Amino acid sequence: HLWLVRKKDGKLQVLLQRRAKHKESFPDRYDTSSAGHIPAGSDYRESAIRELFEELGVHAKAEDLVYCGTRRVVYDGEFCGKPFHDRQVSKVFYLWFDADESAFNIDPAEADRVLWMNLDACIDGVRHNTFPHCIEMDELEILCSGLKVDFA
């Protein structure tokens, strides 16, 4: 998972993308700047920059991504009304990137808009579920660790 980060008016901001309305999982919910599944054996950084370009039209270099940590998910239950078994290993990265929301070339198959949000407001909103999202608190904690900022 790749987070685009910038500093604006002295505060850290993260770019969120709102998933497209037709997506089977989490439609109309805000998510990580860019994320995707990678083929077995593929490089995490190369996959992250490929997804970033496909989803948002942003070119980046693998060496510019800052590694924050690894997130593991093991889930057995129900999702979208069907039995679901999820096994994920996600590498969490961030990339310093400052551009207006209108500058992104959003793939409508993936998302319908992007939004810069202050990091502390994002954490608070996810914690208290005050905006539609599919962001996990543990991922924000990993991001904050990589950014070397307090996870409030």
Predicted stretch roles:
Residues H1, Q13, R113:
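Conserved beta-strand and immediately adjacent loop positions that scaffold enzyme active sites
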Residues H1-D9:
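Acidic, metal-coordinating catalytic segment for phosphate/diphosphate chemistry
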Residues L2, V58-K61, H128-C134:
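Short arginine-rich
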Residues K8, A20, R71:
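Short, flexible active-site-adjacent loop segments at beta-strand->alpha-helix junctions, enriched
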Residues K11-V58:
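Conserved Nudix-box catalytic region and its N-terminal flanking loop in Nudix hydrolases
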